[in-house]
Amino acid sequence: MQVLVKVPGSCGELIQGKVSGKDLLVTCPINLYSQVSIKESNHNNFENINKKSFLAITRTLEYLNIKTTNYKIKLVSELLQGKGMASSSADISAVIKAIGLINNVDLSAEKIAEIAIGIEPTDGIFFEGIVAFDHIKGEVLQYLGQALP
């Protein structure tokens, strides 16, 4: 079995600040993606997996209570690093989702947020559409609608 997960980047923060004492971040997904492919293998083979993505692998496996693995995991990103395109958030969330799916667990966006927030503050780009998101606590404050195609 092979799993392929794509998570969009963003065009930067549309809104960032605090509302009623809660941190708030609104980002808009774009048509550029981080893509993770994963399949079972004879040994672990990680391609283009950086430190944060590796943490996403280990923390997701811990959550799923999986002790040993043999996966070939490849991450390919169209997103520029360090340019406000949510590249780390897209990489991390794509890895989390893929690890769940290869183990027959469809992790919710809320669970992905919980795991991702344990690694770094994260954008809510893995939620459907556009959300007002507490990027520190990993909580959706409000669903704002679908992004334009």
Model segments located where?
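ATP-binding N-lobe of GHMP and related small-molecule kinases
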Residues: 1-83
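C-terminal nucleotide
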Residues: 3-4, 101, 146-149
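Predominant activation on well-ordered alpha-helical scaffold segments within soluble catalytic domains
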Residues: 15, 54, 58, 93-100, ...
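Short capping/connector residues at structural and topological boundaries
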Residues: 16, 31-35, 90, 138, ...
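ATP-dependent small-molecule kinase catalytic core of the GHMP/sugar-kinase superfamily
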Residues: 21-23, 108-149
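Phosphate-handling active-site elements
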Residues: 65-72, 99-115
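DPxDG-like acidic metal-binding loop motif
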Residues: 83-107, 125
